[in-house]
Amino acid sequence: MGSFFDIGCKPYNNNIGDRGLTVGLNRTASNALEALFDEALQERHLEIHEKIMMYLPLDQISFSELSKEEFNLAIKEIQTCIHSRRESNEYQSYQRRMWEEEIEPLVQQDERYQQ
C-alpha cells in the first residue's frame, strides 16, 4: 500500500461532480515523491513542508492546507529542484517521471495554480 496524494480542488464552474484532485500511488512512487518533497522544501520552507507532510502517518500527502502563495511556492521549488539536477540517477529520474505523470497534471488543474 502506498500513499494518497490530495492536491486540492478544481475551480468551481457550476458543474455537479467531484472537484477533488487526488491520486493514490504505490509505496515505491510515494516514497520517491516524499523524498523529492523533502529535498525541495524541508531545508528552506519547513513550514510548507510540514503542512504537506502533516498527514503522512495516515499515508496521506496533502497540498490542501496550503494558501495560494504557499501552493505556488511549493510547486516552483519542486520544479526547480527537479530541473536543477545536472545528472539524474535512476531514482531521481523516477521521481521526475512520477511528478510529471501523476502529480503535475493535477497541480495544473488546481484553482490556486499560477504558471
Regions found by a protein language model. Give the residues of each.
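Acidic (Asp/Glu-rich) sequence patches and key acidic residues
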Residues: 1-115
